[in-house]
Structure formats: structure tokens, C-alpha cells
A protein has these predicted regions:
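Active-site environment of divalent metal-dependent phosphoester hydrolases
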Residues: 38-39, 60-62, 82-91, 104-107, ...
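Divalent-metal (often Zn2+) His-rich catalytic cores of metallo-beta-lactamase-fold enzymes
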Residues: 188-245, 251-252
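Active-site-proximal loop/helix segments of hydrolase catalytic cores
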Residues: 147-201, 214
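Metallo-beta-lactamase
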Residues: 4-18, 108-158
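Second-shell loop/turn segments in exported
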Residues: 54-58, 180-185, 207, 230-233
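C-terminal regulatory/interaction regions
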Residues: 2-5, 238-268
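Active-site metal-binding motif and surrounding structural segment of the metallo-beta-lactamase
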Residues: 49-51, 58-103, 202
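Conserved beta-strand hairpin/beta-sheet module of binuclear metal-dependent hydrolase folds
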Residues: 13-68, 159-173
Length: 268
């Protein structure tokens, strides 16, 4: 399989959002940058005149925009795979919805439901707070949709997805040059081990629902950042000192609200 760099894509400006299209030959990956208020990303996988979406937009204008894009492709829409982002259920109404039982629970009763409630309060009528109803539960560790095999990796909240045919992984968050939520040292170690696993497997591209497409160099950058967080936490006695030290080392990083949350976890 030919390796594709994260910059090897064509870009389609949809008005609000951007579509970055990666051509793997038999399979195309359409990475949708929503440009919404929570920097969501969604991923359309296309093969043999069929397609499905990994995660979905949750603002009504993005929903309309993406539906029009998919219609314009002239493909048969085979369903929506919902892992970490359960809101936006008006998208492609009537299409199959795939999820695991733990992800469905997370979206309807767990932390995902709480986030949706908060977003609905913050964003009002522009936000589609309706939660997807799962029509097709994924009970095994593999599933095939639109002729594309997916490997399912259950996580604490939901699940990650590997697409072996194009050597791509989808996980909730990475973001190599921004702060992210790190819930203490054990969580940092878990993320490091996860990213090292991607490196060992030689994964081509890493997809996440809050950042543009990334690669293994980005994974290495994130590992170094996480190691630094652990070191800085060991050297500082208060959350405030920790945040100052991290910001000094990573002054260009966005996501200071996530750094605040991380500090709260490290200094309980």
C-alpha cells in the first residue's frame, strides 16, 4: 500500500467548512473540517460508489452543508458511525446508525449526554442537540460497511476505529501542537502507550474528531509533550505553578481551557 502524507489531499471549500480529500485508489477519505464552535472533524469513507461517515456534524448549518456534499458525490450513503459525538441526529435522517453499546450509553446517559446538554445551553438554536438512536449495534471487534472493513477497539467511553485497507486510525483526540485533556499521570501513560502502538504498527494517518489529519511524527511530538507534563508536574507543587511552567515551555499552544482541566486532574 502506498503511503500518503497528511498534506497529499485536494481541498474543496464548502462555504463554512472545508473538505480535504485523500485518494488511496479504491478508497477515498473525505476529511470534513466543520469550522464550527467546537472545531469538529468528521470523516466520509468512500468505496465502490458507496460511503459512510465516522462521527457527524452537530450544528445545523454544517449538517445541511455536508448532506449537500454527499448528495453531490452521487454515492449510496450506507450509514453513520457514532463513537464519541452523539449529537446531530437530524443528519441523514433514516440512514443506519452504527455504534457500540458502551458508546450508546455514553451518548444517552454518560459523559457525552452531559456535554451535549452543556453545548445546547451555550449554542442555542444553531446546535442540534438530538441524540442518535443506534440501529445497528457493533458487538464484535470488526464490521464491514460500504465494502470497507473496520476494526473496533473499545475504549472507556466509546471506541476507536482502524481501517486496515488504508492503514488509518480514528481516535477521539490527539492534536500535536495544542493542549488536550490529560486526566493525571496514569492517563498520560495510557496515551503514550496508545501512540507508541500506532508507531509500532506503522500507521499512515491518524484521524481525530477535533483536529486536522495527523501522522506518526505528530504522535512523537505528542509523546514528548506528555512526558514533559509528567516531568513538570513532578517539579511543581501547585496547579498554578504547573500551568505557568507548561505555558512557558509551550507558549504557542492553544487550548488553555484544556490545560486548566489537566492541572485540575494532576493536582487533586
Amino acid at each position: 500500500m502506498a503511503k500518503i502524507e497528511k498534506t497529499q489531499h485536494t481541498t474543496v471549500n464548502l462555504g463554512k467548512g472545508l473538505m480535504e480529500v485523500y485518494d488511496f485508489g479504491a478508497v477515498k477519505l473525505h476529511a470534513y473540517k466543520t469550522n464550527d464552535l467546537i472545531t469538529d472533524e468528521c470523516f466520509l469513507i468512500e468505496k465502490n460508489g458507496k460511503g459512510f461517515l465516522i462521527e457527524a456534524p452537530c450544528f445545523f448549518d454544517n449538517i445541511k452543508e455536508l448532506e449537500a456534499y454527499i448528495k453531490g458525490l452521487g454515492i449510496s450513503y450506507e450509514g453513520t458511525v457514532i463513537a464519541y459525538h452523539g449529537a446531530g441526529a437530524s443528519f441523514m435522517k433514516g440512514a443506519p446508525v452504527y455504534s457500540t453499546r458502551n458508546a450508546d450509553e455514553y451518548s444517552h446517559k454518560g459523559g457525552g449526554a452531559a456535554l451535549v446538554s452543556n453545548f445546547a445551553g451555550a449554542f442555542g438554536d444553531s446546535f442540534d442537540s438530538s441524540i442518535y438512536t443506534t440501529t445497528n449495534f457493533i458487538d464484535g471487534n470488526t464490521i464491514t460497511i460500504a465494502d470497507v472493513k473496520l476494526n473496533i477497539d473499545i475504549t472507556t467511553e466509546a471506541f476507536d476505529i482502524e481501517i486496515p485497507e488504508i492503514n488509518v486510525i480514528y481516535t477521539h483526540m490527539l492534536g500535536h501542537d495544542c493542549h488536550s485533556i490529560v486526566a493525571g499521570i496514569s492517563h498520560a501513560d495510557a496515551i503514550i502507550n496508545q501512540l507508541k502502538g500506532y508507531i509500532e504498527k506503522g500507521i499512515n494517518l491518524i484521524l481525530t474528531s477535533h483536529y486536522t489529519v495527523e501522522n506518526l511524527d505528530d504522535a512523537k511530538t505528542k509523546i514528548a509533550y506528555l512526558d514533559d507534563l509528567k516531568r513538570i508536574a513532578a517539579e511543581n507543587k501547585t496547579a498554578e505553578d504547573f500551568k505557568v511552567a507548561v505555558q512557558k515551555k509551550y507558549s504557542g499552544y492553544s487550548g488553555l481551557n484544556y490545560l486548566d482541566m489537566t492541572a485540575g486532574f494532576f493536582y487533586k
